[in-house]
Design a protein with these regions (language model features):
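The serine-hydrolase catalytic nucleophile loop
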Residues: 105-117
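Conserved acidic catalytic loop of the alpha/beta-hydrolase fold
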Residues: 157-175
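Short beta-strand element of the alpha/beta-hydrolase
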Residues: 96-104
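C-terminal subdomain of alpha/beta-hydrolase-fold enzymes, centered on the catalytic histidine
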Residues: 244-398
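Non-catalytic accessory segments flanking enzyme active sites
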Residues: 15-90, 95, 294, 303-306, ...
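Conserved alpha/beta-hydrolase
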Residues: 119-145
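Conserved hydrolase catalytic core segment
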Residues: 118, 122-124, 172-220
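Glycine-rich "HGGG/HGxG" loop immediately N-terminal to the catalytic nucleophile
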Residues: 62-64, 110, 127, 140-154, ...
Length: 398
């Protein structure tokens, strides 16, 4: 007899009918006219999406992604009434440090797959055995193969509590956490909750910058450039955020009915990653691991799981949580564990060290790297893994 704490093996087996339906829908797309500008200022460009659709129906193989996922140990377990899907790869090095790593939107566990080898088996990737991790990659509630919450309240704080339960259930009394995008918000919440066993966090996005932008330093050229990037995002890159934080259900109808509509919505996230992805499709010149196959893998996962609307609801929850916090006038509790932060140059706003120290006075590790963007682990998995190793190295037990 099963119980609520069971950890159950998971294997993906997509019905042929689902793939045939996807293909029919893509081929039946009703296309808009071309944008009237030569950049993305009106949105995702027609040439990019049409080339993506052509590849999706003529050159892409979902079964290859399915096999890649099924080659990894996957599981589900029920936490707080929601079935959570996760990948759990234990290193061959028994003294490895347990690490829970959280993806964001419009990402999934797909964006983290390239870092699995470097993090769990560093000796095969130019690293040392003492830098190994036991890796846990959960799918956020309402994302991918995790179930949709059926009640309100699944904001970053609640997800952080669920992740602490997951690590306890897996038998890890001491672990670290990492995240970017939505995952950065969840990991930040874990650091502020400081559950027993969590000894450090590492982030690639300074998610808290939006709420305190007027308090962030603007003295140096780098700081002023970061302010400029943040202002540009708030004025010209905020469309998806505003829609999903106010009307996720409304956009959800389109996201679950049109694969091409879903693809365009997911591509229209940030300028740096959009142009890199566009280059992969239009010019056939991918940047890092942002290849045509990996991009379509991620979009197809959203489509097959029907999670366009449910994933968007995290933003609605976040908006209400932040509004309530602002109305209360109470500052969030401090992060009481060591914090590591890596600034990737293509991030929506590449936070200077002074900004990271403002948000995290206990900053223990900071580095600026020369390449990579918002999807750091996806685009540059080896570099990303190097940063994660460096950030957590002082926290390992000898």
């Amino acid at each position: 007899m099963s119980n609520g704490n069971d950890v159950r093996p998971f294997r993906l087996d997509t019905p042929d009918e689902a793939l045939a339906d996807l293909r029919r829908r893509v081929e039946a797309t009703r296309w808009p006219s071309r944008e009237l500008v030569d950049d993305r200022s009106q949105g995702v460009q027609l040439a990019t999406v049409q080339e993506l659709a052509r590849y999706w129906t003529s050159g892409y193989d979902w079964r290859a992604c399915e096999a890649k996922l099924n080659a990894l140990p996957q599981f589900t377990t029920s936490i707080d009434g929601v079935d959570i899907h996760f990948i759990h790869v234990r290193s061959k090095h028994e003294d490895a440090l347990p690490l829970i790593m959280t993806h964001g939107w419009p990402g999934s566990v797909v964006e983290l797959l390239g870092s699995v080898g470097p993090l769990t088996d560093p000796t095969a990737h130019g690293g040392a055995a003492e830098d190994a991790f036991h890796l846990v990659l959960p799918s956020l509630p309402g994302y991918g193969f995790s179930a949709e919450p059926t009640e309100l309240g699944w904001n970053s704080n609640r997800i952080a509590q669920a992740w602490a339960q997951l690590m306890d259930r897996l038998g890890y009394p001491r672990y670290v956490a990492q995240g970017g995008d939505v995952g950065a918000s969840v990991t930040d919440a874990m650091g502020r909750q400081a559950p027993e066993g969590l000894v450090g966090i590492h982030l690639t996005l300074l998610a808290g910058a939006i709420g305190i932008k007027d308090k962030l330093p603007a003295n140096t050229e780098q700081e002023r450039a970061a302010h400029g990037a943040l202002e540009t995002f708030m004025k010209d890159g905020f469309g998806y955020f505003l829609e999903q934080s106010t009307r996720p259900q409304t956009i959800g109808y389109s996201l679950l009915d049109s694969p091409v509509g879903l693809a365009a919505w997911m591509l229209d996230h940030d300028t740096d990653s959009y142009y890199k992805i566009s280059r992969a499709f239009v010019d056939g010149e991918p940047v890092g691991r942002l290849t045509r196959d990996s991009v379509v893998d991620n979009i197809t996962l959203y489509w097959l799981t029907g999670t366009g609307a449910s994933s968007a609801r995290w933003y609605w929850e976040a908006g209400r949580f932040l509004a309530a916090a602002a109305a209360s006038g109470q500052a969030p509790p401090p992060v009481s564990v060591p914090v590591g932060f890596t600034a990737f140059p293509g991030e929506i706003w590449a936070a200077p060290r002074s900004w990271a120290e403002t948000v995290y006075p206990g900053l223990a590790y900071f580095n600026e790297v020369e390449k990579g963007g918002h999807f750091a682990a996806w685009e540059e998995p080896e570099l990303f893994a190097t940063e994660v190793r460096a950030a957590f190295r002082p926290l390992r037990q000898s």
